[in-house]
Amino acid sequence: MSQESDHGSGDGLALQEAQPKVKRPPLYKVMLLNDDFTPMEFVVHVLMLFFGMNEEKATQVMLHVHTRGVGVCGVFSKDVAETKVQQVNAHARQNQHPLLCTMEEA
């Protein structure tokens, strides 16, 4: 019966366990799209309510969306981004505004 250790085969080489490579989950940008009907005040309200922005930051993002057609509200994990998109779109519909929120991989 052999007296070899579990860590080698007797040829001077030791086995080393490979460290699993952990890949970070992809992040997603949540974006608002400009339209000609949603009041600017409502967009600021949405940014403060769902993205935790203060009034100054929300106004800056709203103006960016208004002038460029689209603006990033935040970057989140997929589940959080999907939830925020659904919440914003539902809130806009409940208030009879056509504001549209989307997401894409960052």
From Swiss-Prot:
Pfam families: ClpS
One GO biological process term: proteolysis
Function: Involved in the modulation of the specificity of the ClpAP-mediated ATP-dependent protein degradation.
PANTHER family with a match to the protein in the record: ATP-DEPENDENT CLP PROTEASE ADAPTER PROTEIN CLPS (PTHR33473:SF19), ATP-DEPENDENT CLP PROTEASE ADAPTER PROTEIN CLPS1, CHLOROPLASTIC (PTHR33473)
Family: Belongs to the ClpS family.
Subunit details: Binds to the N-terminal domain of the chaperone ClpA.
Protein name: ATP-dependent Clp protease adapter protein ClpS
Species of origin: Methylococcus capsulatus (strain ATCC 33009 / NCIMB 11132 / Bath)
Gene name of the encoded protein: clpS
